């Protein structure tokens, strides 16, 4: 988990977040779940997480998100607007990626508050990302990570967070399998995302 936690620290320190702002994290896979915990060091007013898998929503709730939106049965844009009294999110962090992430990016634009920021940290495939110029007036879009701190410093901070429990990883582990079942592990992750999140391969 340390490499992903390190990258998550760098991403969250790249994102321009002011204390008290509302942060929405789209996608609660491993990276999204790590970011939802690490972003707390930026003192947001509220952290809202969004996913389409009930299992991931349940885990996100256990990890302390202020609000969890299950988009399998809820309109995420409408829910975010309601939770922010119509304003929208100050910051939206897009962690879905892939083909599904294209629609998620559209929703990010719809739920973003005036002068808000969308931070893309996922990889996308298929069609180009749709950007609505009118909707994006007076807003910011950033991608990747730009940070003055060296990766080694962020890795040390990530390790400290894992050790002292500020970032909880054991809740992310849904399965432990012997290494001989590596193909089954990948099949589970790609074909049954509603049943698995973190799969650990064990060598005895």
Model-derived regions, located:
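A local structural motif
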Residues: 44-45, 88, 166-171
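Residues in the short beta-alpha loop(s) of Rossmann-like NAD(P)-binding domains
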Residues: 52-53, 124, 147
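Glycine-rich cofactor phosphate-binding loops and adjacent beta1-alpha1 units
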Residues: 15, 58, 63-141
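Mid-domain Rossmann-like dinucleotide-binding core that forms the NAD(H)/NADP(H) cofactor-binding site
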Residues: 1-74, 78
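C-terminal hydrophobic helical "lid"/dimerization subdomain
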Residues: 102, 106-109, 114, 152-204
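Active-site PLP-lysine loop of aminotransferase-like
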Residues: 143-149
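Electropositive phosphate-/nucleotide-binding environments in soluble metabolic enzymes
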Residues: 1-6, 54, 74, 86, ...
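Conserved beta-strand scaffold positions in the cores of enzyme catalytic domains, especially
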Residues: 68, 141-143, 172, 176
């Amino acid at each position: 988990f340390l490499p992903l936690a390190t990258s998550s620290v760098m991403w969250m320190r790249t994102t321009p977040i002011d204390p008290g702002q509302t942060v929405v994290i789209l996608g609660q896979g491993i990276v999204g779940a790590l970011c939802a915990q690490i972003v707390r060091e930026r003192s947001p007013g509220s952290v809202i997480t969004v996913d389409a898998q009930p299992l991931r929503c349940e885990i996100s709730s256990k990890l302390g998100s202020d609000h969890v939106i299950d988009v399998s049965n809820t309109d995420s844009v409408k829910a975010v607007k309601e939770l922010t009294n119509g304003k929208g999110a100050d910051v939206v962090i897009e962690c879905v990626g892939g083909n599904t992430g294209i629609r998620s990016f559209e929703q990010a634009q719809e739920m973003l508050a005036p002068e808000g920021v969308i931070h893309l940290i996922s990889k996308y495939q298929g069609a180009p990302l749709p950007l609505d110029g009118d909707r994006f007036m007076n807003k910011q879009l950033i991608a990747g990570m730009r940070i003055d701190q060296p990766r080694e410093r962020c890795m040390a901070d990530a390790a400290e967070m894992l050790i002292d429990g500020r970032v909880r990883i054991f809740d992310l582990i849904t399965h432990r399998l012997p290494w001989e079942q590596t193909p089954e592990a990948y099949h589970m992750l790609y074909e049954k995302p509603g049943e698995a999140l973190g799969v650990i391969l064990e060598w005895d």
